[in-house]
Amino acid sequence: MRFDLEPPSSTAAAHRIGVLLINLGTPDAPTPRAVRRYLAEFLSDPRVVEIPQAVWQVLLRTLILPLRGRASAKKYAAVWMPEGSPLRVYTERQTDSVRHLLTSNGYHVMVDYAMRYGSPNISHALAQFKRAGVERVLLMPMYPQYSASTTATAFDAAFDALARMRNQPEVRTVRHYADHPAYIHALAEQVRQYWAQHGRPDFAAGDKLVLSFHGVPKRTLDLGDPYHDQCQQTGALLTAALGLSTTECRVTFQSRFGKAEWLQPYTAPTLREFGEAGVRRADVFCPGFTADCLETIEEIGMEVRDEFLAGGGKAFHRIPCLNGAPAWIGALGEIVAENLQGWPVRAAQPETVS
């Protein structure tokens, strides 16, 4: 194996600490070519699609990418912001806010972000840390619930980059925070603040709150992936924090891909059924997405909305993701600080932003 070039070793090195926030990724532009390039990388990950690659790559290159590239590009174009992809824009803002929070509390750390697919990639971010003298790295996935297809593959990419380093940094990983009190508090605050501005559903009249998580094949649950259970755990804690019953608040799963059975109940059919059953208002919130993206803005805000209204529903509300909410930035700072304990950060734990 050839190792990456290293800066000269020095006892006067910076000995810095780096915090890397990791999200899924996004195309560089809402064009068919950029989307196909992104999907090719994403769907070629064996952690994402567990089909023998010799068979899968033929299907991917000859059928899926040509068909989905243009259709997906139109969807991305519908949600694209002036600054770029929503996921990248919100992740950059979160990174800036966490950096400011930690710095203002005396933390001597670097904070950056990377995407598992697309750019900026994890290998590049770790190389940037190394050039800045970082010798300790905390990998902080922006996935509250652990899954092999998200968290594990992010760690795979980081460890692949480390495998090419002669002089590796010390590394810690945040596996999940599905039940972290600060995360649950931030979710509850996001819902409460939305209701304060737009009115609370009339649960006594049958209105519903739906907590929609990204789906994964049911087979992964049977094989031991904890994602389903952690989504249910988050859902139960948030339901309790809001003072709701399991009749008033339901957990569902979205973004099914292919014909295999995925985790159920599925989000879109559930909303359609609610409309047909006479539910007048449905609010949908996506606790597993820490930043708004195609799956929340377009899939939930447009496709799922249309299903509910077509079923007879009258009022549909998509509650925005955590994005840059102060309670969420404070929770991120708290989770990061807990996982930096024992490293020379030169300051106390940051306070929660109010």
From Swiss-Prot:
CDD domains: Ferrochelatase_C, Ferrochelatase_N. InterPro entries: Ferrochelatase, Ferrochelatase_AS, Ferrochelatase_C, Ferrochelatase_N. GO terms for biological process: heme biosynthetic process. It comes from the Bacteria. Pathway: Porphyrin-containing compound metabolism; protoheme biosynthesis; protoheme from protoporphyrin-IX: step 1/1. GO terms for cellular component: cytoplasm. The keyword Iron applies. It is an enzyme of class 4 (lyase). Keywords: Cytoplasm, Heme biosynthesis, Iron, Lyase, Metal-binding, Porphyrin biosynthesis. It is found in: Cytoplasm. It holds the Pfam family Ferrochelatase. Belongs to the ferrochelatase family. This is Ferrochelatase. It comes from Burkholderia lata (strain ATCC 17760 / DSM 23089 / LMG 22485 / NCIMB 9086 / R18194 / 383).
